Amino acid sequence: MAIRSWTPEGFVNKKLVRPASVSTNLSLELCTFPTTLGSSVAANALEQLFVVEKSLQGDYFTCSEEVKTFLKDITVAVKKLEEMRKNTVELLEIESMELSRLYFLLETVPNSIHRELEECIADARKLNIIEISQIKRKIETMNNEVKFLTNKISELKSMNEVLGAKQAELAKRHEQYVLLLNQTLEEKAAATIYINDTYTRMNFEREEIELQKQCMQETTQLIEKQKQDYLEKKEYLAIRIKETKQSCDDKRKETYYKKKELTRLQNKIIKMKQTVTSGSVMISDQSIEINILHEAITIWKKKVEDMRRLCESLEEKLSFFVTQKQNLDTTSTEKKNAFVNKIQKLGEKIYKLNTENEDLREKLSTLLKQYKATLKEEEAVSLKKQMLSEEHQKQMMVITQKEAFLSQREHDIKFMENGFGVLNDLNRASREAYGRQIEVMAKNRQREIQRCVINQWRIFCTRKRHAHWLQKIKLSLKKIIIQIEIVEQKRFQLLEETKHRKKEINHFVHLIETLKEQLAQDKKDYVKKEERLIEELGTYETLILNEIQINKVKEEELGETLPQLQVAEEDFREKNRMLRSLHSDVSAKKQDEKTMSNTIFRYRKDIIRCTDGTENMKREIKHLRDLESEKTHKHFEILKNLENEIYVNDQKMALLILENQKLREYLAYLKKEINEYASKQVVTVQHSGDLSWQLIVQHSHYSDLLSGFQIIIKELVGTGEDTMQEIKSLVAKLQYRDEKIESISTWLVGGFERLRRLMEEDSPASLSKEDLQKLGKKQKNQEILRFSPSSHARRLTLSRICKMLKKQSRSRKKKHRPRTII
């Protein structure tokens, strides 16, 4: 190597001058960089991230905690990148100052040192190019591995989609079975309600019939009391008539004796006249006394004429009373006959009513038997209905939880998509900025490598750092590969378990189909029974009310499920926290393995339980209705466990989309069913209207009959009261007549005694033949006017009436006897 002078001219060699690679000026044009290094993109990204951070710190930003933590990590990483960028800018400025100083020194360095430096820089470039190529190859291998993993993930997604579709089909079948059971139970409940209504109506009719019976009994008791009173009064009147007859007979005998005495007196008078005629000579002295007696006789004749007039008036009164008595007897007999006819008609009506009551009692007994049988069936059905309602509530709870979970996941997905788009934009902008920066840095680096030797030491240090970084990456990749292998093993185990569970589900589906057929047969039998009951009982009035009540209950249940949605959200947040802890802690994977082993042990226990349940189902097939609820409950638990496993193992977007589709289909299905229920409701309303009109017509007919019967009873009661009043008035009249007759008889007895005294006082000669004839005529007339024909007619009428009443009472007793037995 030639020694050159240390002058500035000696440093300059025209052959070695490279203006393209080395700068001859003292300026920093080649080593200057932009002060921001993509500051516009970074500033925009930072502004967006600061907005996101503020929204995360606030309460109005609704997002899942996973997304929040993810965005917070991104903000922290971007802040670190910004700090690194600033540090790199500062370091680049320091290096630019050093490079400018080195450029100045290089101008004063000889050419030999310049060549050596250029060779070193060229070797360093080659080494850097080789290392860069190796790093690119490693990056390509890593990208290939990432693609392979993405393909595996897509395959797993497809498997999960298939499993989700199968699960949706199973859920649809389960919903159909539950809906069929609900329909049958609703029909049974409607039938029970209708039976209860009919039973209440029958009880009401029974009460009305009992009230009518009580009214009839009261009327019969009143009639019997009136009969007893009438018979007592009749007996009293008969006794009085007998007494009057006896008194009349006694009076006749007395008059007969009096007639005999009068004849004796007449004979004595004749004898006295004979004696008077024979002794007229001797009685001349007594002529004055005879004249006095004649005057007394004239006075007595006047008195006798007055008595005769009084007797004639009394005879007229007696004839008037006899005619009135005959008229009253005829009217009373006619009224009695009318009352007897009415009583006979009432007895016939009562007999008809009793026969109708017997028929109704027989019908009631048959209906009670049927009602008891239906009650037993309804109790069994009610127990099953309670079990099914509990299971249905649990299923609705799970469905609402899923809906809430899906809605929350939809919101999370939207926020994630927005965040993912923002992050993609940030990534693109940062890549573009860093690409530009890398290009500028590479160009400047090449120039700087040509200019400085200190970078070799930095390159050596970076190689060491790079080797250390490669070792770390290799270790991390090995760990990731081990984790992937563990995950694949778990996936394989899960696939095997899913296959086993598919077999079990198919077995359960087969059992459910058999149960469905048996339920259909039971339903047909029950429908036949219901048709018979409906033909006898009649109406479906309460179906609309029951449906309205069921809709209200469903609305209340939907309102009650809102707090359960909040509980489900809290559970979801807790699960997300658990997932964060699992992602953050690598050491927890061993615990996951333990938990997986525990879950496998639990699954085995569940499988053993399922096998035990199937054996119990085989034994207890006869008790289908009791086992339906248990089987559905077990099936529901198995499905729930499967869903939970799928949720734990597959936390990805495809399953959420599928579940959203399922929910939409289920809502459409519910809308269809609601429309069908509405159409059925219209039909049932029409049928119930027709049947209600028939019931109203029958009820009106029955009420008309009842009102007629009540009117007849009221008329009978009124006529009975009228007859009682008439009988009382007749008894009063008869008592008044008897009193008058007794007064007349006493007056006549007094008159006869007076006549007897007068006859004893008077002489027989003083009475003439004409007077005697008149007295005999009076006595004959008096004998004729002793009421013998009227009393005889009274006796006959009273005896006839008594016989008629006795016959009627006997016939009524005969008619009433079987009724009392019933």
Swiss-Prot record:
Keywords: Coiled coil. Residues 129-164, 223-397, 510-537 form a coiled coil. This is Coiled-coil domain-containing protein 175. The keyword Coiled coil applies. Signal peptide: none annotated.
